[in-house]
């Protein structure tokens, strides 16, 4: 239920209705950081919500990209409008009850948040190239940033290549940081921004320019967003594949941490992640680089369920048993991953780790694993096939829901029938051979003169039943 108070209810006894505490008045009128530059050099910003006359017509013409109207208004000196006129797009009405909010709701806000922009920024963000050219011809400053961002930041974020080119030709700084410490190249992140990045690099943008707080390079951003083409461009232009941000993350760590947004895009996400990781590794990235928490690419790929990436990293020789700062191995990460990893074949991740010498799950933790992954019987199957005995308590059947038992009846019937019972001789032989070759399984198994079917059996091929 929404609650509201009228000014009469909130004002103190004997105080006039429109009275405002001097401190509140100073706080409300305090300029924001982004407005300081403009307030030092010209009149106050035009509030778009209350604008009228030529100011309103100018604002609407810029929004619409009407270059003729913009030109006519700027040609009329009596309007007092200029190419660098600053507009405030915030809503000042929300601050009128500022004093009453403080007193009745105990809410505090130290500054009046202005949202400042210029016609140049609006034209750049909306792709109005001709308006942009007109404003620049009339001496609009390309690096003006009353709201904390330049027009070049806006054009790059929106992916307007033509606007980016116009601004760069006009002298816009390709390495300037915005209020968040990000440079234009950091904002080339969406579809259609590859050409913007190429232009920035051609006009002198630093390929490894770092953001001010996170200390991230553009390659970190491309890797985190799964932008394969941009990562390829940056690497070809000399980006460092092992650059570290403030938390010690390399682009490879960021790439391995790419998450699927839904079950339906899991396969496509893993495919992009694999492309990125292959690209970074071929450029010389360290496959075993650790961050400040000792997390390695393998930990993150396992946690996100990227089976193909796990296989790639293991083929590079990284250890399947390295622990992070919290004592988690890659196998722990795979089994503790989010539920979305179910769509990304966790059984393939688990099998790859076990076939590369990962230490098995402690038997006492198997009931918890069964409860967590009961809807994915292949994951349970591959884990149980590394033991000579099914080490589950007899009451473990209660950990699986009746619906899951019914759906996977054949597998779970075979599983619970083997609790504390001897396994088949064939399975025991597999366990003995794998134990004998422990530490060299990936190299030794393919070299054995065995039929393909038997080789797959030794490599824990899925059968859908336990013997």
From Swiss-Prot:
SMART domains attached to this UniProt entry: ANK (SM00248), SOCS_box (SM00969)
Expression sites by tissue: Expressed in the eye. The highest expression is observed in the iris, with moderate levels in the trabecular meshwork (TM), the lamina, and the optic nerve; slightly lower levels in the ciliary body, retina, and choroid; and very low levels in the lens.
Documented effect of changing residue 94 to Q: In GLC1F; uncertain significance
One Pfam family here: Ank
Subcellular location: Cytoplasm; Nucleus
Pathway field: Protein modification; protein ubiquitination
Keywords: ANK repeat, Cytoplasm, Disease variant, Glaucoma, Nucleus, Repeat, Ubl conjugation pathway
Phenotype for residue 48 to S: In GLC1F; uncertain significance
Entry superkingdom: Eukaryota
Keyword Repeat in record: yes
GO cellular component: a single term: nucleus
InterPro entries per record: Ankyrin-SOCS_Box (IPR050663), Ankyrin_rpt (IPR002110), Ankyrin_rpt-contain_sf (IPR036770), SOCS_box (IPR001496), SOCS_box-like_dom_sf (IPR036036)
Mutagenesis / variant outcome for changing residue 295 to L: In GLC1F; uncertain significance
First and last residues of every ANK repeat: 115-144, 147-176, 180-209, 214-243, 247-289, 293-322, 326-361
Record keyword Mitochondrion present: no
UniProt-listed GO biological process terms: intracellular signal transduction; protein ubiquitination
UniProt record similarity statement: Belongs to the ankyrin SOCS box (ASB) family.
Disease: Glaucoma 1, open angle, F: A form of primary open angle glaucoma (POAG). POAG is characterized by a specific pattern of optic nerve and visual field defects. The angle of the anterior chamber of the eye is open, and usually the intraocular pressure is increased. However, glaucoma can occur at any intraocular pressure. The disease is generally asymptomatic until the late stages, by which time significant and irreversible optic nerve damage has already taken place.
Domain notes: The SOCS box domain mediates the interaction with the Elongin BC complex, an adapter module in different E3 ubiquitin-protein ligase complexes.
Protein name: Ankyrin repeat and SOCS box protein 10
Gene name, Swiss-Prot/TrEMBL: ASB10
């Amino acid at each position: 239920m929404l609650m509201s108070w009228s000014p009469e209810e909130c004002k103190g006894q004997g105080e006039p209705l429109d009275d405002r505490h001097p401190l509140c008045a100073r706080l409300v009128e305090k300029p924001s950081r982004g407005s300081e530059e403009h307030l030092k050099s010209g009149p106050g910003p035009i509030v778009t919500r209350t604008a009228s006359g030529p100011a309103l017509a100018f604002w609407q013409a810029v929004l619409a990209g009407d270059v003729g109207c913009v030109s006519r208004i700027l040609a009329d000196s009596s309007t007092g409008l200029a190419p660098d006129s600053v507009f405030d797009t915030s809503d000042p009405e929300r601050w009128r009850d500022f004093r009453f909010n403080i007193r009745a709701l105990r809410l505090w806000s130290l500054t009046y948040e202005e949202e400042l922009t210029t016609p140049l920024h609006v034209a750049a963000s909306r792709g109005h190239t001709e308006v942009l050219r007109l404003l620049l011809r009339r001496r609009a400053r390309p690096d003006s940033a009353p709201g904390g961002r330049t027009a070049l930041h806006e054009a790059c974020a929106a992916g307007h290549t033509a606007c980016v080119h116009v601004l760069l030709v006009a002298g816009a700084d390709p390495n300037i940081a915005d209020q968040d410490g990000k440079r234009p190249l950091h904002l080339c992140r969406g579809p259609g921004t590859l050409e913007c990045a190429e232009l920035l690099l051609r006009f002198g943008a630093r390929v490894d320019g770092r953001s001010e707080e996170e200390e991230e390079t553009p390659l970190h951003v491309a890797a985190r967003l799964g932008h394969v083409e941009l990562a390829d461009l940056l690497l070809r232009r000399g980006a460092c594949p092992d650059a570290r941000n403030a938390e010690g993350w390399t682009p490879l760590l960021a790439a391995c941490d790419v998450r699927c947004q839904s079950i339906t895009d899991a396969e496509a996400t893993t495919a992009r992640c694999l492309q990125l990781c292959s690209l970074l590794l071929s450029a010389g990235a360290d496959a075993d680089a650790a961050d400040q928490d000792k997390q390695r690419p393998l930990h993150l790929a396992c946690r996100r369920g990227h089976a193909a990436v796990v296989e790639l990293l293991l083929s590079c020789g990284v250890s399947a048993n390295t622990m992070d700062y919290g004592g988690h191995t890659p196998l722990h990460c795979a089994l503790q991953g989010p539920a979305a990893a179910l769509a990304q074949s966790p059984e393939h991740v688990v099998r790859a780790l076990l076939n590369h010498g990962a230490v098995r799950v402690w038997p006492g933790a198997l009931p918890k694993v069964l409860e967590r992954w009961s809807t994915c019987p292949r994951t349970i199957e591959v884990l149980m096939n590394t033991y000579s005995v099914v080490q589950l308590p007899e009451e473990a059947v209660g950990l699986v829901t009746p619906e899951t038992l019914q759906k996977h009846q054949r597998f779970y019937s075979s599983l619970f029938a083997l609790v504390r019972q001897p396994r088949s001789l064939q399975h025991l032989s597999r366990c003995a051979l794998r134990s004998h070759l422990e530490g060299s399984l990936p190299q030794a198994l393919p070299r054995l003169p065995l039929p393909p079917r038997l080789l797959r059996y030794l490599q824990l091929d899925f059968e859908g039943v336990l013997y």
